[in-house]
């Protein structure tokens, strides 16, 4: 395709800590089992350097899975948060979404290691102060 849009759902993930835009790219990996058993955090950052970047990342955080991800065990794992995040910068959008998630469940940025690893690889930035962020409350 000429362009593609990455549309993940914000949720907790046992191994990666979070499934957002970067982790969503695991859907294009043939052998996900290998990635999940060989430094998953680094693999998530690495895949962002190999694939054609999405023209837009749209994170659906309307209902988010706060525990027992990626599948969940019950409705109690899900919370109505009414959030939506969009950016061309995959690291920035995942950073913002993680900060949002942290309001629902303790999940500091440092625990989602693939964010810093991707920033080191120059995939994007975790420094949200560098960006022109527009917040809309509905």
What would you call each of these model-derived segments?
Residues 1-138:
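Extended, low-polarity segments enriched in aliphatic/aromatic residues
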């Amino acid at each position: 395709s000429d362009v593609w849009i990455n549309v993940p759902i914000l949720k907790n993930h046992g191994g990666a800590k979070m499934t957002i835009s970067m982790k969503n790219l695991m859907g294009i990996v043939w052998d996900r089992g290998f990635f999940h058993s060989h430094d998953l955090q680094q693999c998530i950052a690495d895949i962002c350097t190999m694939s054609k970047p999405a023209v837009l990342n749209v994170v659906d955080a309307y209902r988010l899975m706060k525990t027992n991800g990626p599948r969940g065990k019950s409705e109690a794992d899900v919370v109505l948060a009414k959030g939506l995040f969009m950016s061309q910068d995959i690291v920035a959008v995942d950073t913002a979404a993680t900060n949002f998630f942290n309001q629902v469940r303790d999940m500091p940025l440092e625990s989602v290691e693939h964010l810093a690893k991707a920033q080191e690889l120059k995939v994007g930035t975790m420094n949200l102060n560098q960006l022109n962020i527009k917040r809309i409350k509905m």
